[in-house]
Amino acid sequence: MTTAACRKCRDEVIWWAFFINIGQTTYKGVLGVLSGSAALVADAMHSGADVVATLVTMFSVKVSDKKADEKYPFGYGNIQFIASSIVGLILFFGALYLMYESTMQIIAGNTSSPSPFAVLGAIVSIATNELMFRYQSCVGRQNNSPAIIANAWDNRSDALSSVAVLIGIVAAVVGFPIADRLAAIGVGILVAKIGIELNIDAINGLMDTSVENDVLVDAYNIAKDSQHVHGVHYIRGRNVGEDVHLDINIYVDADLKVFESDLVADAIRRKIEAEVDHVRDVHVGVTPVRIAA
């Protein structure tokens, strides 16, 4: 279950990501220029895009907290899927630019061996981004936040990029100068792939793809095992940002009075919302059936 501590982490993690990405953009950019590493400069540009992506995530999480109103009766949660898509697009088009620029430099013959100091920048970047990926992934999963999960994968892409950068820098230092530019292209391929995957996930969320099966099974079992219920006609759900909305129809004895059927449905709704993670809205419909004696 999502605890108060999880919600506190949710409010803090994006600020951590924001300031860390600013720091990484600065130190990798400066170190890349001073050491002559094109791959590290490219990695710094990637971190710069991460700053923008984190701002988008910050905005979307804030807006998604707004209560449902007349204009948006199901709430503002889906803005997190839009934010996830924007993060993915930033990564994808940034990756295309990196690959294009590095390819042009190779064609022009602009390859040189960077200073060994560039290795330090790549190592620090790998460690920092992997830690931020794990931190944000935990917070994103516990809060069921697609925007924070997307931002976590943004950091994982940066960590993978830095691995490619490290390999390229080391290879260039030991006598293969073109490896630095090739590493920058490798960074672009990895980042573009993650950008595409984030957009696919965001589109699935906006298209109301069914929620995880575990959520449906837990809710189904609660409804099925409730008093006066003679079966579950159907159950379906969708993600609305961090929240899960469920629609359930149950079979009850036709001899039950209307208010009694309503009490059964209300008890099921409250039990599901209390016991199933991330479920915030449950609609329980009732279908009367004649029970054979």
Swiss-Prot record:
Q: Name one GO cellular component term.
A: magnetosome membrane
Annotated GO biological processes are: iron ion transport
What the entry lists under Pfam families is as follows: Cation_efflux, ZT_dimer
Q: Which residues lie on this side of the membrane: Lumenal?
A: 34-78, 127-158
* Entry keyword annotation includes Isomerase: no
Where does this protein reside within or beyond the cell? Magnetosome membrane
Keyword tags:
Biomineralization, Ion transport, Iron, Iron transport, Magnetosome, Membrane, Metal-binding, Transmembrane, Transmembrane helix, Transport, Zinc
Q: Which residues lie on this side of the membrane: Cytoplasmic?
A: 1-12, 100-105, 180-293
Which residues fall in a coiled-coil region? Answer: none
Matching entries from InterPro entries are given as:
Cation_efflux, Cation_efflux_CTD, Cation_efflux_CTD_sf, Cation_efflux_TMD_sf, CDF_Transporter, Magnetosome_CDF_Transporter
Q: Which domain of life is it from?
A: Bacteria
Q: What is the effect of changing residue 247 to A?
A: Isolated CTD does not bind metal
Q: Where is this region: Transmembrane domain (TMD)?
A: 1-214
Q: What else is known?
A: This bacteria has on average 16 oval magnetosomes of about 81 X 58 nm which contain membrane-bound crystals of magnetite (Fe(3)O(4)).
Q: Which family does it belong to?
A: Belongs to the cation diffusion facilitator (CDF) transporter (TC 2.A.4) family.
Described by its record, this protein's role is as follows: Plays a dual, essential role in magnetosome formation; required for magnetosome vesicle formation as well as biomineralization. Probably binds and transports iron. Requires heterodimerization with MamM for stability.
Could you give the subunit structure recorded for this chain? The isolated C-terminal domain (approximately 213-293) forms homodimers. Forms heterodimers with MamM.
Task: Report the domain remarks.
Answer: The C-terminal domain (CTD) forms a V-shaped, dimeric metallo-chaperone-like fold and binds 1 metal cation (probably Fe in vivo, structure determined with Zn(2+)) per subunit. The CTD is probably responsible for hetero- and homodimerization.
What is the name of this protein? Magnetosome protein MamB
Task: Identify the gene encoding this protein.
Answer: mamB
